């Protein structure tokens, strides 16, 4: 890894029906900021506004998103529309955009394309125990919705995936 890659700052955003999760990674693997933002009304416009504020505040070199158009990825039309608007916003701000498929993410974190989100979250909680261990949701029951905190782990995974490729 070259010196400039070690010093760069990444903003990774994981979109969901709840809102979005985010992670800011600096240097090799320093988790500077992370969290999730729940958006209840006017989801796309409000999500876009929050993400723009994060770009202005964090001044990342790269924006990392999940590739919503990758083979095998099923995302709601609203999420795909928001994704396009975020890419346009980033390009308008001359920000490099990297898109990573869910398959690539699982391959890097689990060495297995068929792994599940809970397994990825557990790996990330071990990698960043001080930051993420207390936010690790319990294993989801089949009849329950995914915990909104999973968006944080998705975002951290996206950032690490880009950093380590």
Task: Name what the model sees in each region.
Residues 1-165:
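Phosphate- and other anionic-substrate recognition elements at nucleic-acid/protein interfaces
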């Amino acid at each position: 890894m070259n010196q400039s890659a070690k010093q760069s700052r990444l903003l990774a955003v994981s979109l969901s029906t709840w809102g979005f999760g985010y992670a800011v990674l600096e240097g090799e693997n320093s988790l500077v900021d992370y969290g999730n933002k729940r958006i209840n009304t006017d989801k796309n416009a409000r999500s876009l506004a929050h993400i723009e504020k994060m770009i202005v505040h964090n001044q990342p070199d790269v924006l990392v998103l999940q590739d919503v158009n990758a083979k095998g990825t099923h995302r709601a039309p609203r999420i795909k529309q928001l994704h396009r608007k975020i890419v346009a916003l980033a390009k308008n701000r001359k920000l490099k955009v990297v898109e990573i498929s869910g398959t690539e993410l699982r391959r890097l974190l689990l060495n297995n394309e068929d792994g599940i989100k809970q397994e990825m979250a557990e790996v990330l909680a071990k990698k960043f125990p001080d930051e993420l261990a207390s936010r690790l949701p319990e294993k989801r029951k089949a009849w329950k919705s995914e915990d909104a905190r999973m968006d944080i782990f998705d975002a951290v995974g996206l950032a690490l995936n880009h950093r380590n490729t």
